[in-house]
């Protein structure tokens, strides 16, 4: 499987899993009425509508901010998708696919509902992590993949410009 196809598979699976969990929990359960759902001593399902970006920063109540964030997400997805098309390692392709799938999943929420549906809350003792969703987890995993790819000898070699006379990477 080429790096691009691996990335495309990661993108599609991320998008499907993200939207399926959000739609299933919101429309297929009574979570909205009976939250929180205790999954483990350190994890709950809750309903949080995030009108901002990561960690709830830059909350947007108006329509202009909402659509600017949708446009920014789509522009980032297009740019990262073009990078994914040129990926030369499977790890890079998958990492970019996870990020693009997550960005598109959250953009769909923001366009449809004006906010992103977050539902996973991790906590222990007095410590509490922000509430997130599958798309957010995929974006974080993708960023970790980008870092790992950049640190690998193959990843560094893949980004080196071809020597004069070397063929361009095959798309």
UniProtKB/Swiss-Prot annotation:
Regions crossing the membrane: 7-27, 64-84, 88-108, 128-148
GO biological process: proteolysis
Membrane topology designation: Multi-pass membrane protein
Reaction(s) catalysed (UniProt annotation): Release of signal peptides from bacterial membrane prolipoproteins. Hydrolyzes -Xaa-Yaa-Zaa-|-(S,diacylglyceryl)Cys-, in which Xaa is hydrophobic (preferably Leu), and Yaa (Ala or Ser) and Zaa (Gly or Ala) have small, neutral side chains
Active site: 118, 136
Assigned protein family: Belongs to the peptidase A8 family.
Protein's name in the database: Lipoprotein signal peptidase
